[in-house]
Amino acid sequence: MQRALYDPVDPQLLGSLAPDLQFRVNGEVYRFGDEKTLRRFMQEPELWCGLLRDPVNGSRFRPSTRSPRVYFVGGPYYFASDSTRDRFLDDPGRYEVKRAL
């Protein structure tokens, strides 16, 4: 079985392994086929990232432009509630998701 990773903004493009065509949201790595789709994703990640896991309580949710968020170590973190965002800010190293690029 062949598996390919597609660009989340333009599924016609294959995601690149190049470090300059990658972006993190909640610690998850997203890969892009070109700079244009990467820039578009970075402007509004909540439109393209799909379901996320709140790094504090593990709940799954679909972020929106109104979702609580903070920027930490290379990308945005979205939260299911203000209370989990506040807990994250109290000790971000504890909740940071670490994934290798």
Task: Report residues per predicted region.
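Short cysteine-rich clusters marking metal-coordination/redox-active sites
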Residues: D7-D10, F23, D54-N57
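Hydrophobic core segments of beta-strands in well-ordered, beta-rich domains
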Residues: R31-F32, Y78-A80
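Residues immediately within or flanking Cys/His clusters that coordinate Zn2+
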Residues: A4, L51
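Short, structured interface segments
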Residues: G27-C49
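Short cysteine/histidine-rich zinc-coordinating motifs and their immediately flanking basic loops
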Residues: P19-V25, R66-F72
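Cys/His-rich microdomains that often coordinate metals
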Residues: L14, F61
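Short loop/beta submotifs within extracellular cysteine-rich repeat domains
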Residues: G15, L38-F41, T84-L89, Y95-V97
